[in-house]
Regions:
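Core segments of cupin and vicinal oxygen chelate
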Residues: 2, 9-52
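Eukaryotic phosphotyrosine signaling hubs
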Residues: 5-7, 70-74
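Vicinal oxygen chelate
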Residues: 10, 33, 86-117
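Helix N-cap motif at beta-to-alpha junctions
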Residues: 14-15, 80-82
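Short amphipathic alpha-helices within nucleic acid-binding modules
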Residues: 21, 83-88
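Short, charged/polar surface micro-motifs in flexible loops or helix N-caps
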Residues: 48-52, 60-61, 81-83
C-alpha cells in the first residue's frame, strides 16, 4: 500500500474567510464545498497537485471531534514566484534564507520559501 495524496486539515473560525484568503493569495482552487451536520460547511482547497487543505470550522470540530482540536500545524509552502508573493504577503517582514512568514485573516502564520529544486 502507498500514500497517493495528502490533505492537511485546518480548523478555523470562518471557513469562507480563510478559503477566500488562499484562493486570492495562492490561487488555490476550491475542489469541494460540502455541508456538515447542523449547518456547518467544509471547504477543500487544492494548493498544488500534491497538497490539499481541508478547512473545518473550529466550532464543528469542538463539538464532534474535540480530541483533535489542537494547535495549527506549521505549514511551509514553496514557490517559484517568491518575490511577487513577498510583495503581496510579506508586509515588511524580514526575509531569512529565502523564506518569510505571513498570516491569514485569523492570525494563523505560515512560511513561504523560494523553490530551490
Amino acid at each position: 500500500m502507498s500514500v497517493t495524496s495528502t490533505r492537511v486539515m485546518l480548523y478555523v473560525e470562518d471557513v469562507q474567510v480563510i478559503s477566500d484568503f488562499f484562493v486570492t493569495t495562492l490561487q488555490a482552487k476550491i475542489v469541494a464545498n460540502e455541508p456538515l451536520p447542523e449547518g456547518y460547511r467544509t471547504i477543500n482547497l487544492q494548493i498544488t497537485d500534491q497538497l490539499t487543505l481541508g478547512l473545518f470550522p473550529k466550532a464543528f470540530i469542538a463539538k464532534y471531534s474535540p480530541e483533535v482540536l489542537g494547535p495549527v500545524p506549521s505549514l511551509l509552502f514553496f514557490t517559484d514566484d517568491f518575490d511577487a508573493l513577498y510583495a503581496q504577503l510579506g508586509d515588511g517582514r524580514p526575509q531569512m534564507n529565502g523564506t518569510f512568514n505571513f498570516a491569514d485573516p485569523e492570525g494563523n502564520y505560515y512560511v513561504m520559501a523560494k523553490n530551490t529544486t
